[in-house]
Amino acid sequence: MELLEGSRRSDAMAVLRDACENWGFFELLNHGISHEPNEQSETVNKEHYREHYRRFREQRFKEFAAKTLDSGENVDGDNLDWESTFFLRHLPTSNISQVPDLDEDCGSTMKEFALGLEKLAERLLDLLCENLGLEKGYLKRVFCGGSDGLPTFGTKVSNYPPCPKPELIKGLRAHTDAGGIILLFQDDTVSGLQLLKDEEWIDVPPMRHSIVVNIGDQLEVITNGKYKSVMHRVVAQTNGNRMSIASFYNPGSDAVIFPAPELVEKEAAEKKKETYPKFVFEDYMKLYVRQKFEAKEPRFEAMKTMDAVISSQPIPTA
């Protein structure tokens, strides 16, 4: 990120553009998020799992999995994930104080952690605007275009314990992310994350203090396909306990999502592809929860039927 402040800014922006257009993923170093709250959040979340979730959820999960994986019979690996998770919501309202067994230290650490990530996500959105030729702040205004004027922002903490038979089950099945821009701190010692590029699965290796960023479905729609969300998955490992902390900066639930008119006009002049649909983000999410592990294209097609019932709403400029 420090390259954006110096003489190599144009080179850094070109790398960012290529990553968004051709990969849907990129990795940030020197991103401005202090290592201390990141390391604290990792520590407290590991302690939280050890003291609470591993005692209940993970134990029940392992007991269930053992019945199938040990025998190798009746395993429906297409409908199972070797993953234990909990979720924290930051915006529009926080639920941290309501999360069971989440102690005060963990909660305050995660609040500080989330505040820095929220600012970083908004900075990244402005960099995307610059590369796209959109007005600064455009993407944030779209995301905040709902009735409360706020985005949806939350964090998913995932734990992937050692798996006795990883050939039978994924840590997390292949999917694209439904929302906007995703910032991931992945485990810096245990690997597993892969992305799909040209029909080939490519490892995203652990790198200490880096943030893996990926494009969600909503940015694909807003950019009218110029930037793509990409299938990714987590491969279960026989050794090591993998933890990841993923923060999702998404549109508000009733925000209306549609291709940026400026991009559509430009592509129309160049006689390029048809436009993506227009829809309310919450409606897309209702479909996504049923089809998360399926291809995204049918979801976009299904949303086209809703175009006629959504009125055009100008995005505020202030």
From Swiss-Prot:
It holds the Pfam family 2OG-FeII_Oxy. The keyword Iron applies. InterPro entries: DIOX_N (IPR026992), IPNS-like_FE2OG_OXY (IPR044861), IPNS-like_sf (IPR027443), Oxoglu/Fe-dep_dioxygenase_dom (IPR005123), Plant_2OG-oxidoreductases (IPR050295). It comes from the Eukaryota. Keywords: Ethylene biosynthesis, Fruit ripening, Iron, Metal-binding, Oxidoreductase, Vitamin C. Fe cation binds at H175, D177, H232. Residues 151-251 form the Fe2OG dioxygenase domain. PROSITE patterns: FE2OG_OXY (PS51471). Pathway: Alkene biosynthesis; ethylene biosynthesis via S-adenosyl-L-methionine; ethylene from S-adenosyl-L-methionine: step 2/2. It catalyses: 1-aminocyclopropane-1-carboxylate + L-ascorbate + O2 = ethene + L-dehydroascorbate + hydrogen cyanide + CO2 + 2 H2O. GO terms for biological process: ethylene biosynthetic process; fruit ripening. This is 1-aminocyclopropane-1-carboxylate oxidase. It comes from Dendrobium crumenatum (Tropical pigeon orchid). The lineage of its organism: Eukaryota, Viridiplantae, Streptophyta, Embryophyta, Tracheophyta.
